Amino acid sequence: MKEFRVRFAPSPTGPIHIGNMRTALFNYLFSRSEGATFVLRIEDTDLERSSKGFEELIFKELKWLGIEWDEGPDKPGPYGPYRQSERLEIYHRFAQKLIEEKKAYRCYCTPEELEEDRKKAIERGEIPRYSGRCRYLTKEQEETFIREGRKPVIRFMVPDDEVIEFEDMIKGKITIKSDTLGGDMVIIKSDGMPTYNFAVVIDDALMKITHVIRGEDHIYNTPKQILIYKALGFEIPKFAHVPLILGPDRTKLSKRHGHTYIGQYRELGYLPEAMFNFLSLLSWYPEDNVELMSKEEIIRKFNFKRIHKSNPVFDIEKLNWMNQQYIQKSPVERIVDLAIPHLKKAGYIDEIDELRYNWLKDVISLYKDGLSYVAQIVDMAKTFFVEEVDYTGEMIEFLKSPNSIKVLEAFKGYLKDKSEITEDDVREWMKKAQKELGVKGKEFFMPIRIAVTGEEHGPELVKVLALLGKNRVVKRLDRVLNLIE
């Protein structure tokens, strides 16, 4: 049985987009569910925009999500090198082969000439395509152009009136006519760098890739690549073009929809297992329709035949719900460790000793189950880290009521002789005080909560008071009583 091989081939020109990460994930899931080899290839031929920093970021984000590769720049295999910038001689060798077989040629057209041809085609009501003017240059014509200082590109001869068909694993049979492909295509640019469509064919063929799984925005590239496969006598892989992810307004996911890079979600405190789970369900669903699944369960259930043709919508509310489920199941220590950088960035904490860490654990435990992502702790638990809390005009008016003043003064009096606040003690006092003051329920608890936290809602009040400590609670009571006098 033939060994299946798939690849993820990002360009290190920026952070990984959500759509690209979903493509990487589907390649990974296919490889692990089918026992295939997963190759990571870096397409860094855009020398100006590519950087080692972005390459390292690609490695980091993939590893964070839990995607491991079998071969790649850092995991040498039999078909390397795995960076396109290290494979230039290979591309030139195959380009020369095509020239010798009269399937490609050097083109000396200037940008001005090409632009003029494009304008004329539009004026005639035609789709712009390369005219083919350099297809059959004589040796003398080439020498003249060289003397003029023209640097040639190498163009692949696209056959006229050929019908290119392929069976897409998701979309079914796709048919495209060769005369819609824009004419003879550039395969080597004037600076010697290969174009995407040429390099990707050479790499996929030599790396023995059997299944090319990528976004549907590459469908138009596929017939061009099939022509190159055929011209070089390479075996054509199977293609699967996964539907593009849409925003809530059903347009292509972009920055205007919010965060679009995987790293932005990592930095906000989304858990990798939640993101792995969420992304896997964009276009795919298991037979049992279960939504919350571990990585191992997803791999076990994954079947490429269950990928839908329709475009999935990136539903941030669904992601938040799913991440919340994973946060709830996580040990509090894990959430504390993820929260500390956010609290430091907000200026709420500095160095942390064991005592402070344990206090943080207790504070974060109050909010943990309500977090959609870890960075929310900065706003949710703000009252524990600021000296003074703010009050709205409505809050001040509420606190000015006779019952509110009565409750606050009684609470302050109770604290006067206490060295510290304990949950059991304050709970007992509250029971007695409600009877003695004749103020019960919301009328009793709300003044204390607002005065001490600046919030109308929150975790169990006695726990909040105990964690804030007597000194801060008394300071806030004094301040609010001064404000409302």
Curated annotation (Swiss-Prot):
The keyword Glycoprotein does not apply. SUPFAM superfamilies: An anticodon-binding domain of class I aminoacyl-tRNA synthetases, Nucleotidylyl transferase. Its EC number is 6.1.1.17. A motif ('KMSKS' region) lies at residues 252-256. It catalyses: tRNA(Glu) + L-glutamate + ATP = L-glutamyl-tRNA(Glu) + AMP + diphosphate. It comes from the Bacteria. This is Glutamate--tRNA ligase 2. Belongs to the class-I aminoacyl-tRNA synthetase family. Glutamate--tRNA ligase type 1 subfamily. One of its GO terms (molecular function) is tRNA binding. ATP binds at K255. It is found in: Cytoplasm. GO terms for cellular component: cytosol. The lineage of its organism: Bacteria, Bacillati, Bacillota, Clostridia, Thermoanaerobacterales. Its main location: cytoplasm. Pfam families: Anticodon_2 (PF19269), tRNA-synt_1c (PF00749). Catalyzes the attachment of glutamate to tRNA(Glu) in a two-step reaction: glutamate is first activated by ATP to form Glu-AMP and then transferred to the acceptor end of tRNA(Glu). CDD domains: GluRS_core (cd00808). GO terms for biological process: glutamyl-tRNA aminoacylation. InterPro entries: aa-tRNA-synth_I_cd-bd, aa-tRNA-synth_I_codon-bd_sub2, aa-tRNA-synth_I_CS, aa_tRNA-synth_I_cd-bd_sf, Glu-tRNA-ligase_bac/mito, Glu-tRNA-synth_I_codon-bd_sub1, Glu/Gln-tRNA-synth, Glu/Gln-tRNA-synth_Ib_cat-dom. Monomer. Keywords: Aminoacyl-tRNA synthetase, ATP-binding, Cytoplasm, Ligase, Nucleotide-binding, Protein biosynthesis. A motif ('HIGH' region) lies at residues 10-20.
